[in-house]
Amino acid sequence: MQMPAGRNILIVEDDESTLSGWVELLRSAGYLVTGVSSYEEGRQELATMPDLLITDVRLGVYNGLQLLMRGRMVNPQLQGIVVTGYADQIVRREAVYLQAEHLEKPVDADRLLQVVGNALRSPAAALRVN
């Protein structure tokens, strides 16, 4: 499979088995993927200007929504997928406000691939490629 141009993904997930599974899945689909397990590591990796951030909501003291907002300060076209292990309407509303997709764990592999593809085909993501 040919590598999608300009499709760099940063995954921030504190559960190591989930993180490694998502990294492997997305790499096998042809994406360039960096996976880290903490907010601090994610914040540092935002300097690499990923096209998409997939982040767990709960990341210790901070949360994935804060990380997405921080990333957009550097890269306004950064696409976001926020993942949580619990149903929370407040998190869902905040994700909608940030124009990010919201997924609940466990995330089906086909669903993750579909949501990632949609996020990277969005108009804001297209601005990064052109």
Model-identified regions with their sequence ranges:
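Conserved acidic carboxylate
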Residues: 13
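Two-component/phosphorelay signaling modules centered on CheY-like receiver
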Residues: 16-34
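C-terminal output helix
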Residues: 90, 107-117, 124, 128
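Alpha4 helix (beta4-alpha4-beta5 surface) of REC/receiver domains from two-component response regulators
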Residues: 66, 86-104, 114
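Acidic catalytic/metal-coordinating carboxylates
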Residues: 38, 63-66
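Acidic, metal-coordinating helix/loop segments flanking the phosphotransfer/catalytic sites
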Residues: 34-52
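The feature encodes the CheY-like receiver
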Residues: 60
